[in-house]
Every structure is written in structure tokens, then in C-alpha cells.
């Protein structure tokens, strides 16, 4: 593919993070295969958040844990991903609190909470 572009001396890729939440989603009733693939023991809803700058995933996980009775499944400060599980109301409450804090306290752009 690169040959098709002609001679290229180098390719430069940059990540220029904004202050934003790009995904806030509740999987209300995941199929068993999702739990198995993710390595999640808890049966219930799963919450997923994606943020930039990536390090803010740590803050989101802390807010989620303080907002409701959820289990933190995954926090990746290198990609800005957070995943947690619990009963559906607790997962929704945690996501709502994350969105509210990041928008109103930190001035982030946010997305609507989605659910499947």
C-alpha cells in the first residue's frame, strides 16, 4: 500500500488528545460469552467509558466506585478505557456521575449515556 503512494521518507503519527468522553455505555444484560471474553466474574450490567486524555481513566474509575456499588473490572490509563460491572441501576448511576463530574467540574465534552 505504501508503494502505491510513491516514495515516503517517513510517517509521523500524533495523538492530540482533547478533553472529552467519547463513549459512556451500559450493556444491560450481556450474553455469557461477553463475560467470558472479558474475564468478568460478576453477572449483571457492564459499564464502558472511553476518555481523553487517557490518564483521566483513573479519575473516572474512582468516581464510578464512589458513586455506587460496582466492581471495577478494567482501567487502562494508556488507552483511556474503564470497564465496571454491577446491577443495572448502579452501573447507570456510576456512568451518570462520571459524565456530570467531567462535564461540569473539568470542562470536558461529553456524549449522551447509551444503553443496549
UniProtKB/Swiss-Prot annotation:
Keyword annotations: Bacterial microcompartment, Transport
Localization, UniProt: Bacterial microcompartment
Keyword Calcium: no
Chief site of localization: other
Pathway note: Amine and polyamine metabolism; choline degradation
Keyword Electron transport part of the UniProt annotation: no
One GO CC term on file: bacterial microcompartment
Domain (BMC circularly permuted): residue spans on this chain: 10-108
InterPro entries with a match to the protein in the record: BMC_dom (IPR000249), CcmK-like_sf (IPR037233), EutS/PduU/CutR (IPR009307)
Pfam families from the UniProt entry: BMC
Task performed by this protein: A minor shell protein of the choline degradation-specific bacterial microcompartment (BMC). Proteins such as this one with circularly permuted BMC domains may play a key role in conferring heterogeneity and flexibility in this BMC.
Record's subunit section: Has been crystallized in 5 structures (all are mutated, 3 have an N-terminal His-tag), most are homohexameric with a central pore. In two the homohexamer lies flat with a beta-barrel on the flat face created by the protruding N termini of the six chains. In 2 others the hexamer is not flat but has a six-fold screw axis; the screw pitch is 33.8 or 41.9 Angstroms depending on the structure. Interacts with the BMC major shell protein.
Family: Belongs to the EutS/PduU family.
Notes on the domains: One side of the hexamer is concave and lined by hydrophobic residues, the other side has a slightly protruding, 6-stranded beta-barrel.
Name of the protein in its database record: Bacterial microcompartment shell protein CutR
Gene source species: Streptococcus intermedius (strain ATCC 27335 / DSM 20573 / CCUG 32759 / CIP 103248 / JCM 12996 / LMG 17840 / NCTC 11324 / SK54 / 1877)
Amino acid at each position: 500500500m505504501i508503494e502505491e503512494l510513491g516514495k515516503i521518507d517517513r510517517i509521523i503519527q500524533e495523538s492530540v488528545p482533547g478533553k472529552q468522553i467519547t463513549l459512556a455505555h451500559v450493556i444491560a444484560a450481556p450474553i455469557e460469552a461477553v463475560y467470558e471474553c472479558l474475564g468478568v466474574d460478576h453477572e449483571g450490567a457492564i459499564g464502558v467509558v472511553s476518555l481523553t486524555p487517557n490518564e483521566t481513566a483513573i479519575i473516572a474509575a474512582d468516581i464510578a466506585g464512589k458513586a455506587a456499588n460496582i466492581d471495577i473490572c478494567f482501567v487502562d490509563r494508556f488507552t483511556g478505557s474503564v470497564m465496571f460491572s454491577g446491577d443495572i441501576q448502579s452501573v447507570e448511576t456510576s456512568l451518570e456521575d462520571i459524565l456530570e463530574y467531567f462535564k461540569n467540574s473539568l470542562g470536558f465534552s461529553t456524549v449522551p449515556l447509551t444503553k443496549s
